[in-house]
């Protein structure tokens, strides 16, 4: 038996997903960042390494507040596995662009590696992906968005 139960890690991972969904919807990434321990490390293959909860928060808040992150509000999980002996969670995360107006789905995935600390906290995250795979997906999304008639959202409700 590991240090943590599978149920404890599953619940922490479920909370991680809930907070990512809420933060993607609201634009406030503080609740999501608060899942990390104060000394957590985050490795992001395009942006580099962040050390500490506050550095992770500053990075995620800025990244998801500017394009293209600001148009990427959903992060559904395709699959996940848990190693309860060591406290690891591995998952495939879709980085999904908002609906461009025609209902089409534009997304690209990364593999996320999480290390569970305890008390619902995460001490390590690494997102492994090829940034070059995102460019064609975003280009296709932009093409559809440009051809979709403007709705009240793009006219400020006028």
What label would you give each PLM region?
Residues 6, 29-88:
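A solvent-exposed, acidic/Ser-Thr-rich amphipathic alpha-helical stretch
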Residues 1-34, 38, 144-158:
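Short, low-complexity N-terminal intrinsically disordered segments enriched in polar/charged residues
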Residues 41, 104, 120-121:
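Residue-level signal for well-ordered, solvent-exposed loop/turn and beta-edge residues enriched
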Residues 109-141:
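Short beta-strand edge/turn micro-motifs at domain boundaries
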Residues 61, 92-98:
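Generic short beta-strand segments
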């Amino acid at each position: 038996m590991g240090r943590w139960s599978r149920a404890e890690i599953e619940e922490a991972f479920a909370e991680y997903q809930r907070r990512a969904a809420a933060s993607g919807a609201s634009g406030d990434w503080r609740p999501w960042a608060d899942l990390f321990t104060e000394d957590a490390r985050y490795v992001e293959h395009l942006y580099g390494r962040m050390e500490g909860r506050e550095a992770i928060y500053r990075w995620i808040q800025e990244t998801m507040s500017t394009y293209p992150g600001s148009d990427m509000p959903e992060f559904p999980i395709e699959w996940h596995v848990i190693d309860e002996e060591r406290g690891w969670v591995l998952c495939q995360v879709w980085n999904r662009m908002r609906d461009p107006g025609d209902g089409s789905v534009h997304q690209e995935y990364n593999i996320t590696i999480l290390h569970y600390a305890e008390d619902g906290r995460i001490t390590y995250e690494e997102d492994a992906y090829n940034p070059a795979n995102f460019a064609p997906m975003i280009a296709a999304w932009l093409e559809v968005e440009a051809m979709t008639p403007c709705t009240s959202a793009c006219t400020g409700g006028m």
